[in-house]
Regions:
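Solvent-exposed, extracytoplasmic
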Residues: 138-152, 183, 228-287, 323-350, ...
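Extracytoplasmic/periplasmic sensory segments of membrane signal-transduction proteins
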Residues: 29-193, 245-246, 376-536, 590-593
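Glycine-rich acetyl-CoA-binding "A-motif" of GNAT/NAT acetyltransferases
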Residues: 225-226, 264, 506, 572-573, ...
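Extracytoplasmic/periplasmic ligand-binding sensor regions of membrane-associated signaling proteins
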Residues: 142-233, 238, 286-300, 488-496, ...
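Extracellular/periplasmic juxtamembrane segments that couple receptor/chemosensory ectodomains to their
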Residues: 2-74, 275-426, 630-706
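An acidic, low-aromatic, low-complexity terminal/linker signal
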Residues: 690-887
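Amphipathic coiled-coil signal-relay and dimerization helices
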Residues: 108, 115-119, 166-172, 258-269, ...
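Flexible loop/coil segments at beta-strand boundaries within sensory signal-transduction domains
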Residues: 219-224, 307-311, 563-570, 667-671, ...
């Protein structure tokens, strides 16, 4: 532990606690109250009132340290979680993107047109002939490169190199390179891997900055190298997109990608954190305080989790925020709009709140209960004091102690509320963030699908074989099938690839399990749209619906027309449809977005869903919400504008859940304003928070404090009487103070077989057993009460001075009531059965709390303990009420 301004803080907080404004505000308030407690403790010892506040003062001091520590830890955890999430997603989203690029280079290097051009150039160079004769061929290849980049817009250049590094063709005409000496060429020709991936400066790049290049050899069918193909990734463009999605306006967090040595290779704010700067990484633990540019930052560094075994180029995500701003804007105030019952239920959740956290309000309640009892007992003792001056001072002291206790409790309640809201708001932020992650993964994934179908539709062999169907149907189908199988082997996100002719009849499939579809018309509306394209950028997507091409299951089919290259008029000879393997792919996306604990385990009960604007489920990790069902959630969650998010608490299946939602916005050109395809999908992430209370169940809570005017006996005409009040349920009851010994904690009660139900048992009081009564069944209470909620025993003098105990939920005040406001019950109704002896009329000028019922110890004994009945006369003098002890 480390001491900071008089408070023992956890060592992990010592470097950051001074920057936590809520902790500092509560610390200052509680320490000022602690000084008051010190004075009151001293006055209590000097007053002779018998009220020693030392234990209460020490308990409040200990709880202050516990509470401030937990508040500090939760505020820190929330800030760290936000940084961790951003750093992790920054690197993981990039790695997912690059995983797709590793497939691109391998597939494009097998392109027949590129292979043919490379062969032609090799032969010309081998013969020493002028390559200018291949200008037309080169232009066609460069046009093919342009078509590729129009679809896969993540690339800024494509370069085809000879085995000697000579540039054979390239997309970017402004790039002056004609011959490369980059060792990348030799590595691509010799590597046993499926690709070469480099991030560094290269003579292949027009700019002097480092760039990301994917390369692989182009070979003959027998594996003889012909050339090297390079795809140049738009690294800066992509990192800007990633950082923009993770940032918010006026967010002071700086995001970066670091290389294996800790150098900054991309920054969300290059003026703040420049590219190339060395950065101190946080490699041990979730967070640390790092120094950069003479300033301290709260920071985290996260290695990638990889994707399908691919771990990327060895980069790490890094997030940091100036430490003086790291804990600002915690966002807990947004929970104020939630109904109190919702928050009360949520705060009980053992999944969200550890035993240590849930014990803090219990400790505060126990301390306040002990304080109330101490003040209550002090007032009871003062009622029998024979020294008026001392009594007057002691009463003022007790009143001040009670008031200070209330102020302290108020601060504790507010700080505990802040603590709880910090935990819940952190969960809400997490669900919102994870929903954004899920929909971003989906949009990026489906962007690739829209690209794939259009690019594969340009495969010249597919058009040629469709043209041969009439003359050699079996050979043509076999050739198309081989192409589809080769593609599907590389791209496992598809369950099936299908080629159909101009009439919409299936010609070939990649998955033999769908062989029965061959020769049959697809018969789905997307086929008609597919066969009427506007240009080579056109593609169509089916509705998310069951299809025979996916064995009757729901999926999306992406399709593009195959141009009839022999027609010469821009017509189509068929189309290609790629059947997305929706069930496992969407489930995996959602699984990756589920919240996890510190051990990496999915939080129990959490789940995630993709759904359309009509609330229909597209995918779910929870079997309770299968595909096609409608989610019973507010429409507002599905009315979000594209690219916006929300987080709230909502009841679902008898449980309150934190619900984070985000509406899709597409990725790059996909689903953009210029794209003909629009399909809004929401991602929703759910975390259970606590059970919804049963109908009519009222969350447990203490009755409100009742305050009556404190009158001097000499100041009220006819005198006054002190009444020791308490609550059974929410019923306000009392007994004349002179008949009360004290209140004690309701523990150590032993049940005794054979006694009536209203006798709860016995407990030891001053070394002798006393009976304890439960009066709830004899009071005609307005609503049922929880017997488990009894917290105090009021010890009352019975007949013959034999005491007994009454179970109560909470102690009230001991008001000094004017006798003119006290009426005997027997004046209202003649009965010997009532336990009540008097009623106190409310003082409408000072309070509106209703009637106080004063119970009679003698009647309780007579009715419930088998004693003889000796009812007081209706005209019983109030003097006797105040001063006569039952004999």
């Amino acid at each position: 532990m480390s001491i900071y301004k008089g408070i023992d803080f956890d060592d992990t907080l010592s470097a950051v606690v001074r920057h936590m404004d809520p902790v500092q505000d509560y610390r200052e308030t509680l320490q000022s109250l602690q000084a008051v407690w010190d004075n009151l403790t001293l006055l209590g010892q000097l007053s002779g009132s018998g009220t020693d506040m030392s234990e209460t003062r020490q308990a409040f001091a200990a709880l202050t340290a516990d509470l401030l520590n937990r508040l500090g830890i939760e505020i820190r955890n929330k800030a760290v979680q936000a940084l961790k999430s951003k750093a992790q997603v920054a690197v993981d989203i990039m790695v997912r993107n690059l995983f797709e690029r590793t497939a691109d280079i391998g597939f494009l290097a097998q392109d027949d047109d590129i292979r043919g051009f490379a062969r032609c150039m090799r032969d010309l160079l081998a013969r020493g002939e002028d390559t200018q004769c291949c200008t037309g061929h080169r232009q066609r290849i460069e046009q093919r490169f342009r078509e590729y980049v129009r679809k896969y817009s993540v690339y800024h250049d494509i370069i085809l190199l000879g085995t000697d590094g000579r540039v054979l063709a390239q997309l970017d005409a402004s790039n002056p390179v004609r011959q490369s000496a980059d060792p990348l060429v030799r590595e691509a020709l010799e590597t046993p891997e499926a690709y070469v991936e480099v991030f560094r400066r290269s003579d292949l790049l027009a700019e002097p900055r480092p760039g990301l290049i994917y390369a692989y050899r182009v070979t003959e069918e027998d594996g003889t190298p012909l050339a090297v193909l390079c795809l140049c990734f738009r690294f800066e463009n992509e990192t800007r997109r990633i950082f923009a999605n993770l940032g918010k306006p006026r967010d002071r967090t700086v995001l970066a990608l670091l290389d294996a040595d800790g150098g900054v290779i991309a920054s969300s704010d290059p003026y703040h954190l420049p590219v190339g700067a060395p950065m101190e990484r946080v490699l041990e633990g979730d967070w640390g305080v790092v120094l950069f540019g003479g300033r301290e930052y709260l920071a985290t560094t996260r290695p990638t989790q990889g994707y399908q075994g691919y771990m990327g180029p060895g980069w790490m995500g890094h997030a940091m925020v100036p430490i003086e701003h790291a804990f600002a804007h915690q966002g807990a105030d947004r929970l104020a709009a939630l109904p109190a019952g919702v928050m009360a239920a949520v705060m009980k959740s053992p999944t969200l709140f550890s035993e240590e956290l849930r014990n803090i309000p219990r400790q505060a309640e126990q301390i306040q209960r002990a304080l109330n009892r101490s003040v209550w007992n002090g007032n009871v003792r003062q009622s029998s004091s024979e020294v008026p001056a001392n009594t007057s001072f002691s009463k003022v002291l007790l009143w001040e102690i009670g008031n200070t206790g209330l102020k302290t409790t108020d601060v504790f309640e507010r700080s505990i509320g802040n603590l709880n809201e910090t935990v819940v708001s952190s969960i809400l932020d997490d669900t919102r963030f994870l929903a954004s992650l899920a929909i971003d993964i989906m949009d990026r994934n489906l962007y690739e699908r829209a690209n794939d179908c259009r690019w594969w539709a340009l495969n010249a062999s597919l058009a040629r074989q469709l043209g041969r169907l009439a003359e050699a149907p079996d050979e043509a189908r076999a050739a198309i099938t081989r192409v589809l199988e080769a593609i599907n082997a590389l791209y496992t996100v598809y369950d099936n690839l299908v080629v159909f002719d101009a009439a919409g009849t299936v010609v070939a499939v990649s998955n033999p399990h769908y062989g029965e579809c061959i020769g049959h018309a697809v018969g789905e509306e997307w086929v008609r749209r597919c066969l009427a394209p506007a240009d080579t950028q056109s593609y169509v997507v089916s509705a998310f619906a069951p299809t025979p091409l996916y064995h009757g299951r729901h999926t999306y089919i992406y399709a593009a027309a195959i141009a009839d290259t022999d027609a010469g008029h821009g017509g189509t000879c068929g189309g290609i449809g790629i059947v997305f393997d929706a069930e496992p792919q969407f489930r995996a996306m959602l699984q990756d977005a589920l919240p996890r604990n510190a051990r990496g385990e999915i939080m129990p009960g959490s789940f995630a869903v993709f759904a359309d604007r009509g609330r229909r489920v597209i995918a779910s990790t929870d079997a309770r919400y299968p595909i096609g069902t409608e989610l019973p959630l507010p429409e507002a969650l599905f009315q979000l504008a594209n690219g916006t998010d929300s987080a709230t608490i909502h009841a679902l299946d008898g449980c309150y859940h934190a619900v984070g939602a985000r509406m899709s916005a597409g990725y790059r050109e996909f689903k953009s304003a210029d794209d003909a395809y629009h399909n809004d999908v929401a991602a929703l992430v759910f975390v259970p928070l606590g059970a919804v209370p049963a109908a009519g169940e009222v969350p447990a809570g203490e009755p409100g404090l009742v305050r009556l005017p404190r009158l001097r006996q000499t100041g009220a005409p006819g005198g006054s009487t002190e009444i020791a009040t308490f609550f059974i349920g929410d019923e306000w009851l009392g007994i004349v103070s002179a008949h009360v010994l004290e209140a004690v904690d309701a523990t150590g009660i032993t049940s005794v077989p054979g006694l009536p139900d209203h006798v709860q048992g016995v407990f030891m009081y001053q070394d002798r057993p006393l009976l304890v009564l439960d009066l709830k069944a004899h009071l005609r209470l307005r609503r049922p009460v929880d017997a488990a909620g009894y917290r105090q025993i009021v010890v009352v003098r019975g007949r013959g001075k034999e005491p007994f105990g009454i179970l109560v939920h909470r102690l009230g005040e001991i008001p000094e009531v004017a006798n003119s406001r006290i009426d005997p019950v027997n004046l209202l109704y003649q009965s010997e059965a009532a336990l009540a002896e008097h009623v106190v009329r409310p003082d409408t000028a000072n309070d509106g709390h209703g009637i106080l019922i004063v119970l009679s110890p003698e009647r309780i004994v007579a009715r419930l303990l088998g004693g003889s009945t000796a009812l007081a006369e209706p005209a019983l003098a109030l003097r006797a009420l105040a001063g006569v002890v039952l004999e």
